[in-house]
């Protein structure tokens, strides 16, 4: 079967496209509602459009933010994403729980040292002051840690002795898997795909802004999760239990099985 892939932040981890867009029978996209006209055009040409979950919790967007579902089918990371889509109104037959190969080989290990990583907020607007303020508060409250700041191109500059800087257009997920085991605790205002990898590795994740004070009115709601929230200055709490098997299927399905499923739509 001929298929074409729109990759996004390297999250499509199956085989690359085996045809050009115009020759394809199936088109895998990272979302549909922002590209309504393109999706409709592709469907009018007889192509099936399939949306894959392009980050941890991404498919919750339909339920939480009332997005239109236009694609022919959806590939969910786990059962929780599938159930969210069903609550949003997507027919169960149009949802396949696939996992993602990027998660398949992650193993849990012990992390008892003092290397801490602050994963700074990367946002569509300038949040440099917010990031720097939170980082300074963390350093002051928890001096027992050696601190590193995790930055991306959308984060903006920060003042820190140690930085880990990534480019979302590069092979960012493999980079995260390679380097993240160096750290013993992760602190962030907003958990995302990065923190899902940390949790699978057994690294404690502390969410430092339960009130989401960085958000402006009208900005999208985020996926609900049993996060371990930390009020900066208080003793580090015990990690709350999250059954990651409910959110990420492992091992992931093969592309052959996914393509066979598209024939049923």
Where are the predicted features?
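Well-ordered, non-membrane alpha-helical segments in soluble/globular domains
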Residues: 9-16, 36, 128-141, 180, ...
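Short acidic, S/G/P-rich loop/turn micro-motifs used as interaction or catalytic elements
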Residues: 9-13, 33-36, 122-130, 154-156, ...
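Nucleotide-activated donor-binding/catalytic signature segment of Leloir-type glycosyltransferases, i.e.
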Residues: 157-174
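Hydrophobic acceptor-binding patch used for acceptor engagement in glycosyltransferases
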Residues: 185-186, 204
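Active-site and donor-binding regions of nucleotide-sugar-utilizing enzymes
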Residues: 1-106, 172-182, 193-196, 200
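Catalytic binding pocket for nucleotide-activated donors in carbohydrate/polymer assembly enzymes
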Residues: 92, 193-254
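Conserved catalytic-core segment of nucleotide-activated headgroup transferases in glycan assembly
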Residues: 4-5, 103-161
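Short, surface-exposed amphipathic charged segments that create phosphate/polyanion-binding patches used
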Residues: 67, 108-118, 222, 239-240
């Amino acid at each position: 079967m001929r298929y074409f892939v729109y990759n996004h932040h390297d999250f499509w981890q199956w085989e690359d496209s085996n045809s050009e867009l115009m020759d394809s029978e199936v088109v895998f996209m990272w979302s549909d509602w922002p590209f309504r006209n393109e999706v409709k055009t592709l469907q009018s040409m007889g192509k099936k459009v399939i949306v894959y979950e392009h980050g941890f919790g991404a498919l919750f967007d339909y339920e939480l933010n009332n997005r239109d579902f236009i694609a022919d089918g959806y590939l969910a990371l786990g059962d929780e994403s599938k159930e969210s889509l069903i609550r949003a109104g997507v027919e169960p037959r149009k949802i396949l729980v696939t996992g993602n190969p990027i998660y398949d080989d992650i193993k849990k290990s012990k992390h008892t040292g003092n290397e801490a990583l602050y994963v700074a907020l990367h946002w569509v607007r300038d949040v440099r002051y917010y990031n720097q303020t939170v980082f300074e508060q963390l350093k002051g409250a928890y001096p027992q840690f050696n601190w590193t700041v995790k930055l991306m191109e959308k984060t903006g500059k920060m003042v820190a002795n140690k930085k880990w800087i990534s480019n979302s257009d590069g092979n960012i997920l493999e980079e995260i898997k390679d380097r993240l085991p160096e750290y013993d605790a992760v602190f962030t205002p907003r958990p995302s795909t990065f923190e899902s990898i940390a949790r699978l590795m057994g690294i404690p994740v502390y969410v430092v802004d339960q009130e989401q004070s960085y958000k402006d009115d009208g900005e999208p709601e985020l996926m609900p999760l049993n996060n371990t929230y930390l009020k900066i200055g208080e003793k580090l709490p015990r990690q709350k239990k999250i059954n990651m098997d409910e959110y990420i299927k492992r091992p992931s399905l093969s592309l052959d099985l996914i393509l066979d499923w598209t024939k049923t739509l």
